[in-house]
């Protein structure tokens, strides 16, 4: 094997260049990978062979990406499906100046033939990018790594570029992975076998060879490995679909397996009824050696810290399971925005509570999403939902997840219950194994509901913001000559910013502890409403159940620390007098605030006073 590998290394024709801004030139795609990888965790090393089936466009070069730390030893063109040796292909290596860790392997256009081409690539190298703490808040992003092979674990994803790839490829995969004894590999699809690696295939003795294969196409293949304890069960949904459920946990957490398997079964059963058949043969919960919460086709990769904290809530495990349909079966066309995270948040973080009958928690979740958008996205920092691609900070999270989820809630009210859920099943069925964007979502909902929804998507997806509302000219008086003592209520709702179309429920609290709901439809700068009431009205409130997306007045948001953090005007009032050098419980906090403010303009700094200096609270801004 070693001699044969040396022959591969010596037989290829290679030219290396550097390009400043290489442009994609190939419309060819890879339809299948047949991969063998041998992994040495102690040396961070990978040895690989990949047999690629390419649907090629003749006359155009193939430009395949590969990690810059991997060395391509040989590239060969197979003359037939049974040709395992093939004819050597010359190739050019381009290293991108703006991404020094990446490289492109280019096959000249003259060698690219029409139809299916089979290439075999042999390569080796090191993948060693240890996970680092995120640059942003932990709840927004996981630990950062492009990929890592080490004694603590293996993580190889699309960002690792651990196999040759072409843009826009949706591929099927067969993967054989050899690892030291005691290690278990997990990837997408089904594991077909696991046995000692034969000597003719593996360079070292004592390795275990596992074979995995995907039935569905995927945008990328993620491979993880560690010293797992595997627990599995066969499960059938209430509709009869069979799915293999599994956990791959570290030995100290193996006792949590049944809790995760039970929760997985509950979520799958619910979402199969809502979205249609589960698109894969199995689902696994896999423990990771660094902080993560990632959903891949047929498994989720959760950091050890959250595994230990029983991460089975709807916003946690439920969210990753919904991604099985939304994002991992129907793919997002990221260059045209990201609808996947908002819909997944709506179905998992919110709708699970409504579906299970916990209406109080559902209401709280709507308020949470609405307040999150208002807290983290002031009007001057807003941007259209259609421009969201991924979250990097709280603002992105509030727009791409929370606002988007509320938009789907408003869409559900616009098209009605039956059309909304039928649209989702249609979307999942029609775009299984395909990319979809916001325009595809619009088309599906419009056709299913038989409604023109162009205005809706132009307003909520392509536009910015949400309606800012004010009650005006509200009056109530007894109805004349009414023996039942009824009252007439009227008024108007002014939109103080851009004009939106939106439903708006108004709650009227009356005498005798009665309530009355007035349904209105915002359609202009001022919307009139009128209603006859059976009792005297006492108070009136706009949308107390948070059913629609809107800008909230400051008084409508309960005091929370996030409001202070995101406010542009901040004050700190100390209950203890004296200077920073005096001893008081918040001395270190005050010093840190002053230190952070030192780099800001005077008008942007936090005002710090004591109760003795200022007996009145500031008239504006947040107070701590």
Description of each model-found segment:
Residues 51-69, 161-180, 439, 487-507, ...:
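Surface-exposed beta-strand/loop patches in extracellular or lumenal glycoproteins
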